[in-house]
């Protein structure tokens, strides 16, 4: 039996990737296609713009469209996510959130919604990236304070938030594993005369350009050696496939806040 999937943000890059992934996945079926009010796709066939009509009409009426859906997959922007979350909570529809750029208050709103419906919330749905997160924790536990930690990420010119949600997730992972508070020790870029590096800090560097899908490198720099863990995404399909894996996994789960480590059994 296929999972009835609603997709939010079908006009975006990830929206297209999700439409294509659902069409190729025998375990999922497109049930609803949502986009922002005023979108040129509203009223059109969800797949027509990509040359693959699927019989599902794009709508901006979330509450009506979600009735009967078994999961909503959301890759939009924070302000849109909150509206979709509320609609899902009212109808008991599980949610998979791949949107990034949330502040602390936004993450608290997601956690509150997860008390009513199951929510899988992850900055990156890629199986490879989530394995990288696990490897990052192991490396931080083993290497400890003898190694300086730097996180370098690169994305396409259209990405609006920095550092990426994945980079911040890596920062959280190594901070937890090494007994640090990321908010207190993060350094977001350096300029001018900075003085010597504080060994307890975790540095972030951001690159934006071209059509880079997503590159992340975690660097542990010691004296006489360095360890680098790198993941490079060459297609958004990897994120879409991971999101659909989460959409299937969340079926029948109790309300709660989950992440891809739960989905992949990495906890």
Swiss-Prot record:
Pathway: Amino-acid biosynthesis; L-lysine biosynthesis via DAP pathway; (S)-tetrahydrodipicolinate from L-aspartate: step 4/4. Gene3D superfamilies: Dihydrodipicolinate Reductase, domain 2, NAD(P)-binding Rossmann-like Domain. It comes from the Bacteria. GO terms for biological process: diaminopimelate biosynthetic process; lysine biosynthetic process via diaminopimelate. Its EC number is 1.17.1.8. (S)-2,3,4,5-tetrahydrodipicolinate binds at residues 156, 165-166. It is an enzyme of class 1 (oxidoreductase). PROSITE patterns: DAPB. It catalyses: (S)-2,3,4,5-tetrahydrodipicolinate + NAD(+) + H2O = (2S,4S)-4-hydroxy-2,3,4,5-tetrahydrodipicolinate + NADH + H(+); (S)-2,3,4,5-tetrahydrodipicolinate + NADP(+) + H2O = (2S,4S)-4-hydroxy-2,3,4,5-tetrahydrodipicolinate + NADPH + H(+). GO terms for cellular component: cytosol. Coiled coil: none annotated. One of its GO terms (molecular function) is 4-hydroxy-tetrahydrodipicolinate reductase. Keywords: Amino-acid biosynthesis, Cytoplasm, Diaminopimelate biosynthesis, Lysine biosynthesis, NAD, NADP, Oxidoreductase. It is found in: Cytoplasm. NAD(+) binds at residues 9-14, 35, 98-100, 122-125. NADP(+) binds at residue 36. The active site is at 155 (proton donor/acceptor), 159 (proton donor). Pfam families: DapB_C, DapB_N. Belongs to the DapB family. Catalyzes the conversion of 4-hydroxy-tetrahydrodipicolinate (HTPA) to tetrahydrodipicolinate. This is 4-hydroxy-tetrahydrodipicolinate reductase. It comes from Thiobacillus denitrificans (strain ATCC 25259 / T1).
